A protein has these predicted regions:
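Short glycine/proline- and aromatic-enriched beta-strand/turn motifs that initiate or cap beta-hairpins
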Residues: 19-62, 116-122
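Short loop/turn motifs that connect adjacent beta-strands in outer-membrane beta-barrel proteins
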Residues: 26-33, 68, 83, 99-108, ...
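Residues that define the transmembrane beta-barrel architecture of outer-membrane proteins
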Residues: 32, 53-57, 84-89, 105, ...
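Membrane-embedded beta-strand positions of outer-membrane beta-barrel proteins
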Residues: 38-42, 73, 93, 109-113, ...
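Transmembrane beta-strands of outer-membrane beta-barrel pores
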Residues: 42-46, 75-79, 97, 113-119, ...
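Transmembrane beta-barrel domains of outer membrane proteins
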Residues: 62, 94-96, 139-145, 184-186, ...
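Outer-membrane pore/translocation modules
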Residues: 82-176
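Outer-membrane beta-barrel "beta-signal"
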Residues: 90-93, 181-185, 252-268
């Protein structure tokens, strides 16, 4: 927890309009109303149990139903069994219920939920509803934007279910609390002259989990850089590093690459 405290105190001392499009976590802000976003996420992770790396691919479609509600569907692919194959999919929804706006800042809060289905074998104690586990999650997220800095934090409850024919091991805890802290700063441009300008954002995110049955936990740090092109295209590049863990995990450190394009006013 000392890592979170240091970074949080550092960020609230900054006084420097930032994007709230984080790489690893979702902010309280929503996708633009009437928009449809298409994203392809990829990760290349070090396999902790075998030689080589683990590759995950996740195509996603996001729909901004209105200014307060968005939904997303995802598919999960992995090279787990010596070849890229479909492992499952998921659905995500987020409802923004609080907005406080000022001249150079705003505050948002939202509730979110996720359901995932996965047919992979269960190899690890950590619960991952975006890659390895079936289950559901519900939580809250708050995001503060101050000038060029965005700070976002979330807390959620997750429960893992059986992965099709692979039953969740009884010796492992299947209930978890997830928590995140994300900080992003707009690095370029220093001053806007056109909405077509490429935005460059630097970010640092902390992602953690505690299994409620046994108290085991982990915390990862994820620095990243993001490019937003013509206000529609987005490229994210991130590196995840485990800070500590008392949980067995199949993959800890690795690289993430996400490509996204947003179509505006599709359903308005």
């Amino acid at each position: 927890m000392k890592y979170l405290s240091i970074v949080f105190l550092f960020c609230i001392s900054l006084n420097t309009n930032a994007q709230e499009l984080f790489v690893m976590t979702e902010p309280a802000s929503n996708a633009p109303a009437g928009s449809v976003g298409v994203r392809v996420g990829q990760s290349f992770m070090k396999n902790e149990f075998e030689s080589g790396s683990m590759y995950n691919l996740s195509p996603e479609i996001t729909w901004g139903i209105n200014k307060n509600l968005m939904v997303r569907s995802s598919a999960f692919f992995s090279n787990e069994n010596n070849g890229l194959g479909l492992k499952g999919g998921g659905a995500y929804a987020k409802y923004r219920f609080l907005s406080v706006d000022d001249m150079q800042s705003h505050f948002r809060m939202a509730a979110f939920g996720r359901y995932s289905y996965n047919n992979s074998a269960i190899y690890q104690e950590a619960i991952d509803l975006t890659a390895g586990n079936s289950g559901y999650e519900a939580g809250l997220v708050a995001t503060q934007l101050i000038h060029k800095v965005a700070i976002s934090s979330s807390v959620s409850y997750a429960r893992a279910l059986n992965n099709n024919d692979y039953h969740f091991p009884e010796v492992l805890g299947n209930n978890a609390v997830n928590y995140t802290l994300s900080i992003g700063k707009l690095m370029h441009p220093k001053k806007y002259t056109s909405f077509k300008e490429t935005n460059i954002n630097a970010m640092l995110e902390f992602v953690g989990q505690t299994i409620t049955e046994n108290g085991k936990s982990y915390l990862d740090a994820v620095p990243s850089i993001q490019f937003i092109i013509n206000s529609q295209a987005r490229v994210d590049l991130a590196y995840k590093k485990e800070l500590y863990s008392s949980l067995h995990r199949t993959a800890t450190d690795g690289v993430f690459l996400k490509l996204e394009y947003t179509f505006f006013n599709v359903t308005k």
